[in-house]
Amino acid sequence: MPAAGRISDRLSCGDFIKTGSADVYADGLPLARENDITTSHSIGRDFWRSVKLVEGSSNVFINNRPATRVGDAAEQHCSSSCHVGKVQKGSPTVFIN
């Protein structure tokens, strides 16, 4: 089972999870859900805006939204040639189906 995604966990694109549940936590950090937002990031002169998390569990919900896990994706940052980030790091103690 994949680890639960939380605020401050990193995505493969360089973003971090920025928003999460106001009342459900793992390891002292709010858990992330589908439609929560990532941070923006830049590399050199390139800048990528914040995007929403677009995947989550089909059977675990936090505040009526699918729970985000390691491997779940965020929206594409720009055009079809741009990268898509996936949650890379999650809770070491909470795992979600």
Predicted region positions:
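Intrinsically disordered, low-complexity proline/glycine-rich segments
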Residues: 1-97
